[in-house]
């Protein structure tokens, strides 16, 4: 049952990373996950089961036209991002796009131009920005605890479970 007071979200791409996206969307009280889509029907069916019966599709355009989400979460490979973003924009649907935004700077620029031209909100998904270890590091840097930072390179590898009890989206 769809609640009109909630944000309607659909997911395109039901591979490895989509599992975390789907579970996260299902955890938001103000979100209705209204559809999942993958070209591979078996993946789409599995995602539907993971999402507790959310309708599944193998055709992104059909899904977007049928379920009319407010937001589409594009969790596919980078080469497909532009065409899916263009589809979302043509239907006036905001998009969250898995990083990398596109396979090249030129194609990334096309997506940015598309968003500006159509005035369709499009965002790049950054999944670890709000993880507790990175938030702690940000606080240390902002408080000047390590002095003036001139350069920083972070490799985020740890035995710490970054998924348990942490925001993913």
Where are these regions (language model features)?
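N-terminal Rossmann-like dinucleotide-binding module
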Residues: 1-51
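Predominantly a Rossmann-like dinucleotide-binding segment in NAD(P)-dependent oxidoreductases
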Residues: 128-169
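Beta-loop-alpha module in the N-terminal Rossmann-like domain of NAD(P)-dependent dehydrogenases
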Residues: 55-114
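Rossmann-like NAD(P)(H) cofactor-binding subdomain of soluble oxidoreductases
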Residues: 80, 100, 123-130
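Rossmann-fold dehydrogenase core element
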Residues: 110-127, 147-152
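Short, Asp-centered acidic motifs that coordinate Mg2+ and/or phosphate
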Residues: 35, 70-71, 151
């Amino acid at each position: 049952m769809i609640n009109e007071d909630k944000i309607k979200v659909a997911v395109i791409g039901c591979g490895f990373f989509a599992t975390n996206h789907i579970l996260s969307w299902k955890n938001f009280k103000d979100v209705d996950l209204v559809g999942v889509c993958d070209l591979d029907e078996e993946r789409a069916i599995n995602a539907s089961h993971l999402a507790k019966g959310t309708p599944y599709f193998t055709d992104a355009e059909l899904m977007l036209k049928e379920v009319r989400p407010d937001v589409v979460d594009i969790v596919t490979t980078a080469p497909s991002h532009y065409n899916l973003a263009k589809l979302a924009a043509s239907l006036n649907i905001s998009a969250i796009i898995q990083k990398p935004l596109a396979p090249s700077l030129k194609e990334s620029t096309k997506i940015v131009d598309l968003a500006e031209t159509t005035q369709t909100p499009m965002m790049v998904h950054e999944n670890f920005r709000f993880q507790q270890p990175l938030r702690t590091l940000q606080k240390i840097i902002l408080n000047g605890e390590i002095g003036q930072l001139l350069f920083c390179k972070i490799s985020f590898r740890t035995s710490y479970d970054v998924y348990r009890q942490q925001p993913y989206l």
